[in-house]
Regions:
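Predominantly soluble domains enriched in secretory-pathway, periplasmic, or organellar proteins
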Residues: 24-353
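Bacterial N-terminal signal peptides
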Residues: 14-22
Length: 353
């Protein structure tokens, strides 16, 4: 009897550990995009930026991938109604965005050209384009993927996707508006900045969490988060600095990974499909994640790491932005490559949850 009891205790302990690592919820409520407001825009819509001062939402787009159609288009929407207030033509296709609201600059990643264009949000005119990739040198050639701003240290971090083991991390001095550093052998994909903690967290296509010094941009630490699984390809990370954790979106494998920021230790797996964007809302203690292939957005409780709600979308949700009052979530939603319908923006009223 004692032996049976010991076996039962071990079984319950193993079950508890498994549940703690793989947190889910059978009580999650499902919404559809029809519960919210949407606005069709056009083809090739990618990242979003919310401007509090103008009460505007910017959406970057690359309308065509034809070789002779390299122009980009930035949509400026009224944040409340999603009415299109302006269509801003750009010389290069636009994908990634980062907004410096105080200095009225919207940084736009030109993926295919390996550059970043600076847009004056007061005039809707381009200020300049920073050419980061050097096509004449294979060691310095890469496509821009993500741009993330560190306002405190006046830096813009830009990930460059190159050939295998040839990824680059560009550091732009935003005061001088010029390239300050180029870091190699990091294979960066996505970033998140902890300005107060003077840290920059980088996730890589090889499943690494990389930590940089926010003051110097120098490497402090790099660790494989889940070395047992070689299939990881981390796209983005969101920070919950109050709890000292990060939430990682992985495009190759299922689950949102919750990691300890100072060590890279894997703490939890939140059961979800493979992911693209991830965003943390400290005001509501929620994490939002887009799942392109499964056409849904997850709302995760950051206090319990359990799924709270699911929003089903008609097309493929891509990028996210949050209003300054933390009550509205915006998502860009993409159609399939051969679809005739326009990509669109979804405005999600979080007070409905």
């Amino acid at each position: 009897m004692i032996k049976a009891s010991a076996v039962m205790n071990k079984t319950l302990c193993a079950l508890a550990i498994s549940l703690a690592m793989h947190s889910g919820s059978v009580f999650a409520k499902t919404f559809t995009e029809k519960d919210f407001v949407s606005q069709p825009l056009g083809h090739g819509v990618y990242e979003l930026a919310w401007d509090k001062g103008q009460q505007a939402l910017y959406a970057a787009s690359a309308p065509s991938f034809d070789k002779d159609k390299t122009d980009g288009l930035v949509f400026k929407l009224a944040a409340q109604s999603l009415q299109i207030d302006a269509k801003i033509p750009m010389e290069r296709r636009t994908f990634a965005v980062a907004l410096d609201e105080e200095n009225h600059i919207l940084y736009l990643g030109n993926a295919l050209e390996g550059s970043v264009t600076l847009l004056d949000t007061r005039t809707d005119k381009a200020i300049k384009t920073l050419q980061l990739s050097d096509n004449s040198d294979p060691e310095k050639r890469a496509h821009v993927r993500e741009v993330v701003l560190d306002k405190k240290h006046q830096r813009l971090y830009v990930s460059g996707i190159g050939r295998k083991d040839k990824g680059l991390l560009w550091v732009v001095d935003t005061q001088k508006q010029e390239l300050a550093q180029t870091l190699q052998k990091l294979e960066p994909v996505g970033f998140a900045v902890d300005e107060a903690g003077d840290r920059v967290y980088v996730v890589s296509g090889s499943g690494e969490l990389i930590t940089l010094d926010g003051k110097t941009s120098q490497l402090l630490n790099r660790v494989k988060v889940d070395p047992a699984d070689p299939e990881h390809y981390f796209l983005n990370i969101a920070l919950n600095t109050a709890r000292g954790v990060g939430y990682i979106a992985d495009t190759n494998t299922k689950d949102v990974l919750v990691v300890q920021l100072d060590s890279g230790k894997l703490l939890h797996r939140v059961p979800t499909p493979n992911s693209v964007a991830v965003l943390y809302n400290p005001a509501r203690e929620e994490v939002y994640v887009t799942h392109r292939n499964d056409r849904q957005i997850s709302v995760i409780d950051a206090t319990s790491n359990r799924l709270k709600h699911t929003i089903k979308t008609t097309a493929m949700p891509n990028s996210l932005a949050l209003s300054a009052d933390a009550s509205t979530l915006y998502a860009s939603v993409k159609q399939g490559e051969k679809a005739n319908q326009a990509d669109y923006v979804l405005k999600i009223d979080l007070t409905k949850f």
